[in-house]
Structures are given as structure tokens and as C-alpha cells.
């Protein structure tokens, strides 16, 4: 089996490292990649093809893990060449997922839940071909939601509503605590009710959010566009916070 990767960030690198089998070959391309990404690709040992069109043509499973902004363009440009399953793992809205479904055959809507570079992330999938990906449970927990493309997209957006709003609130409250010289005490009192590892998890969440604020802002914009008939006061405040 050949698995092709569009994008070689944390998601793709994690999958490449987790899904290890002599019966599976990973492929990607350096085409249009940054110098840093090219170096990562070379160091990984993954099979490198000349173009992403070649990657799409040769893949039994083609995984798109790029960014919310580029997900649809990637599908429009290369989806027609994909003969196997097209697994989209980008944090995109259901509307964008449905647009991608028009561009590719055999779309499976997917999301990795949990800290992406942990040893036990969980993959959720939906779509008519989702059953064919359940073999991945041998390498990471894989759960099928339904046969309907878009269901996972809705779930991961709802999760993002919670996680990104909480992250923005953590950033704001910890900065105020730091201003008053009470940062350690702030996490200590919260740990009483939130658990002993709350400080560690919170600092990790804050760091991740600040280091990836552009991508997370794009994801929040997708949420606001899709749930435009809902009360999104907290989401809009989180977006404003991340854009500062």
C-alpha cells in the first residue's frame, strides 16, 4: 500500500512515524516546499517523488494535511489525479469539505483529536469509504463516525470552539497573573479543581497557541463563517485576542 502526503508538518510527520509497516510506503514531494520543510523531508527517509501530481497518481490513500486556507486549492489542483481514498485532515468547515467532495472521488473527512505529537492521538473519520481506513487502528485508534462526509468536520469545529476559546482565556488570565507576580499561585489554585497536571497542560496549550496563532486564527475564521447564525461571542473574542 502507498500513502501519499500533502504537507509535511506535525500531522504528516506524526502519521509517518506512527504508521510503520513493511507493507506500507509513504511518498511525498519537495515541489514548492520551503527550505526548512525540504530539509525535514530529506531527513525523514520518506520516498520523494518529483511532483505532487505524481504523488496523487500513485497513492492508494492520499492525505491532505496542509492548512485551512490551502485545503480546497490542493483538492482542486490535485484531487482529480487521486485514484484511491482522499483523506482530508485539515481543520476546515463542513462547507469547505463539501466543496472538496466535488473535486475528488472517494473523499473521507478526517480529524486527529488529541495532542498531535503524542503517542496516542485518535483519528476520527466519516464518509462512504471510511470503513476502508479502519485498518489504521493497528497503528493509532481510529473511529468511524458515519458514512456522511462533513460529520467529522462539524465535530472538530465544535471542539475548536471550546479549545481555542479556553486557550485565549488562559493566555489572558495568565498574563494578568504574571503582571501581579502571581502566576505560580494562579495555576496552583486552579489545579485544586482542575487536576494536578493542569499547570503543565495549560502552559503547553498557551505555548502551542502563541506559536501557531496564524493557523489557529484561520480555523476560528472558518468557524465564524460556518456557524454565522449562532451566538459566537466567545469565539469572536478569541479571534480578536489571537490577532493582536
Where are these regions (language model features)?
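NAD(P)+-binding Rossmann beta1-loop-alpha1 motif at the extreme N-terminus of oxidoreductases
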Residues: 1-57, 116
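Small-residue-rich helix-loop
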Residues: 182-195
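Interdomain hinge/lid region at the active-site interface
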Residues: 192-244
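Rossmann-like NAD(P)(H) cofactor-binding subdomain of soluble oxidoreductases
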Residues: 52-54, 60-63, 68-122
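Conserved beta-strand segments of alpha/beta enzyme cores
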Residues: 25, 47, 85, 106, ...
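Rossmann-fold dinucleotide-binding core
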Residues: 92-163
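Cationic-aromatic interfacial patches
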Residues: 173
Amino acid at each position: 500500500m502507498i500513502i501519499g502526503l500533502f504537507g509535511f508538518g506535525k500531522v504528516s510527520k506524526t502519521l509517518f512515524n506512527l504508521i510503520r509497516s513493511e507493507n506500507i510506503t509513504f511518498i511525498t514531494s519537495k515541489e514548492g516546499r520551503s527550505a526548512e520543510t525540504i530539509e525535514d523531508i530529506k531527513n525523514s527517509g520518506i520516498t520523494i517523488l518529483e511532483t505532487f501530481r505524481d504523488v496523487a497518481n500513485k497513492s492508494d490513500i492520499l492525505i491532505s494535511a496542509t492548512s485551512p486556507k490551502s485545503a480546497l486549492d490542493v483538492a482542486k489542483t490535485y484531487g482529480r489525479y487521486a485514484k484511491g481514498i482522499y483523506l482530508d485532515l485539515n481543520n476546515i468547515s463542513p462547507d469547505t469539505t463539501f466543496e472538496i467532495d466535488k473535486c475528488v472521488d472517494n473523499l473521507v473527512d478526517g480529524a486527529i483529536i488529541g495532542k498531535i505529537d503524542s503517542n496516542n492521538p485518535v483519528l476520527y473519520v466519516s464518509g462512504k469509504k471510511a470503513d476502508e481506513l479502519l485498518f489504521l487502528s493497528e497503528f493509532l485508534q481510529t473511529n468511524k463516525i458515519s458514512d456522511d462526509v462533513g460529520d467529522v468536520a462539524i465535530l472538530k469545529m465544535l471542539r475548536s470552539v471550546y479549545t481555542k476559546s479556553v486557550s485565549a482565556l488562559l493566555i489572558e488570565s495568565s498574563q494578568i497573573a504574571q503582571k501581579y507576580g502571581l502566576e505560580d499561585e494562579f495555576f496552583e489554585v486552579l489545579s485544586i479543581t482542575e487536576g494536578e497536571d493542569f499547570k503543565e497542560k495549560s502552559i503547553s496549550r498557551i505555548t502551542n497557541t502563541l506559536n501557531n496563532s496564524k493557523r489557529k486564527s484561520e480555523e476560528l475564521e472558518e468557524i465564524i463563517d460556518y456557524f454565522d447564525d449562532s451566538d459566537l461571542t466567545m469565539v469572536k473574542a478569541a479571534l480578536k485576542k489571537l490577532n493582536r
